[in-house]
Amino acid sequence: MALAREIYEHYWEKGWAVVENVYSIEETEHIAALATRLCEELMQEDDYIVDSSDDGARAPRKLDLPFERHPDLRNFALDRRLSSLVGEFINDQPLLLADQIFMKPPHFGSKKPYHQDNGYFHCHPGDKVLTAWIALDDVDEENGCLRYIEESNKGPILPHLPQPGEPYNFVPPADLIDLSKEALAEVRQGGVVFHHSHSLHTSHHNESDR
């Protein structure tokens, strides 16, 4: 799958870019249904993957390393359409470090605070590391699309500090995040959002009924 020049330039200038129509609706619906089934099975044994609503209801939060759990999930993550785009962004042969599926059910959980992926990954050089975020549903502001601090990819990795009561969140100091440069990355089902390992990003609570 060829990468348009303007998308490539947007990625390196702003730190993120959207490529629509990488996967089909049928493919993403199959993966979403499979991930939901696996999460529901795992919820019985692992509270780490569970979110709770205000009324105490439980729903799956995320699935770590899904490519290890089912051949369809492995093929989805390693699909040539995706890997060819990654290779064009980084001008190198891509390797998969890890993958996750975030469920983000409506009215559950909380927003993911601003962070940089390489604040967690510690991979070098940072220009050769990116995240490919595949939309299994239409994603917009209402249901919690990704938000970026544009051009933060050009800066350093900031100190990421643990948050009390949030064992999976490490975040930079708020005064180092320039919210005047925030941009929303809306994407349709089957599209992919790519971002640089230094790009500051967040996603808010799902306020929709989707």
Q: Predicted segment positions?
A:
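Aromatic-acidic/polar surface patches that form glycan- and anion
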Residues: 24, 74-78, 125, 179-188, ...
